[in-house]
């Protein structure tokens, strides 16, 4: 649903085994993938072997950033932003991550972040936190977790504001971004009774 065109370049940070890479490659002029794992990157390369517009780099974003010579129309962080403190060793790793990737945006480019909502409905309904598998860990603001964290809408909005002058649009996939049944936005929030089942 992103309006990516064949004239645009995409940087996919945290591409993993490539579940999104092929879709991006079919829409974009080129896709540059970065992932920490050589094994996941090998799977991605095999999975998308028929896409001649995909380049895969293995390593931490900090380590491969200097090799990025292009500007990108879209930079995606799908299930990755929550791990920024492991990649960026600063006092404000999430703010710094956005500042660093913004340097690689083309004029008018967009950053796309898909991340769990720390206060999401599924956690209130009794699901364990996606990353650490503990009940209420995110709802209680991660008292026992240091390596990963997700944010409420307000917290994420504050991080984005601190990082720079970004124009933001929030979307709300239900029940989550991994397997959305419906995607809401501030222009179209759920009506009474829509969140059943």
Regions found by a protein language model. Give the residues of each.
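Conserved SAM-binding loop of SAM-dependent methyltransferases across substrates and taxa
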Residues: 17-28
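A conserved beta-strand element that flanks and buttresses the S-adenosyl-L-methionine
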Residues: 76
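A short glycine-rich, Lys/Arg-flanked "PGG" loop and its adjoining helix->strand segment in the class I
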Residues: 92-110
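Conserved class I S-adenosyl-L-methionine
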Residues: 112-134
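Short alpha-helix
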Residues: 146-164, 170
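Conserved catalytic loop of SAM-dependent methyltransferase domains
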Residues: 169-196
């Amino acid at each position: 649903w992103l309006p990516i065109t064949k004239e645009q370049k995409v940087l996919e940070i945290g591409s993993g085994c490539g579940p999104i890479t092929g879709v991006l490659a079919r829409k974009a002029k080129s896709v540059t993938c970065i992932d920490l794992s050589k094994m996941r990157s090998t799977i991605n390369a095999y999975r998308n072997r028929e896409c001649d517009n995909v380049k895969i780099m293995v390593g931490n974003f900090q380590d491969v950033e200097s090799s990025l010579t292009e500007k990108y129309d879209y930079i995606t962080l799908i299930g990755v932003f929550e791990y920024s403190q492991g990649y960026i060793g600063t006092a404000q790793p999430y703010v710094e991550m956005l500042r660093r990737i913004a340097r690689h945006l083309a004029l008018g480019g967009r950053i796309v972040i898909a991340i769990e909502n720390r206060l999401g409905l599924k956690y209130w309904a009794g699901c364990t936190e996606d990353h650490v598998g503990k009940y209420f860990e995110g709802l209680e603001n991660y008292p026992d977790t240091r390596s990963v964290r997700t944010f409420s809408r307000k917290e994420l909005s504050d991080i984005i504001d601190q990082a720079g002058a970004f124009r933001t649009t929030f979307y709300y996939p239900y029940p989550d971004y991994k397997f959305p049944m419906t995607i809401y936005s501030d222009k179209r929030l759920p009506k009474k009774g829509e969140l059943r089942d």
